[in-house]
Amino acid sequence: MGIKYKVNESFFEKWSPNMAYVLGYIYADGSLNDSPYMRGKYIQITSIDEDSIQRIKGWLNSEHKIIKKKSNFTGGKICFVLRIVSHKIYNDLFKLGLYPNKSLTINFPKVPKKYLGHFIRGYFDGDGCIYFEKSKGKMNQLIIKRIRTIFTSGSKKFLENMSIFLQTKGLRNGKIYYNKRAFQLKYPTSDSIKIFKLIYKGTSINSFFMRKFNIFKDYFELRPQVVDLTIRRILADHVVK
């Protein structure tokens, strides 16, 4: 028998902001594995951001070790892997729609509306991005034209249903494109701002990947005319002290 590490095996039994976030993150950058001759049933969560893995490990009250290694999927970059052996957690995640080799066929889970923003934030931190579209003016000055938010998945069905759920939050039907080995759900500037409000409103500063939040923040500093009261409050609540 291997070493039995401590972990909160009831974590996925009940919806909460942290549970929804971690579930979203696992849908993006996690996997369920059933290897009877090695570890039995276990989950694996991978990220190039060590803080994200440490945060999830802390929420799960896990004593499992984080493994540092190079990954072919991240272009040879260093990534951090958390493996948790637990039949209970595996089975709870299975009930929530996850299963082994999920990447090409997974569907969007039934997330209570109250926790949709937290789930989307977790997925965004795992497999989403935000970027500027830039150009240069007549005087060679840098012009920020717009921002784009992208969610990536190997499953088109997952992104189609994510788009449907996001429409209940006032977003338009996002455009889905195929890019190399995966599908991408893309949103323009106006919907990107709505996504910002949805995923960051009412959150604490230690509950997300700060680098992605800061890209939004940089955009709002460059385009103060789009900053309304809700955005101003979110930015004020997430000042690093």
Residue ranges and their predicted role:
Residues 1-241:
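Internal intein/HINT superfamily modules and their associated LAGLIDADG
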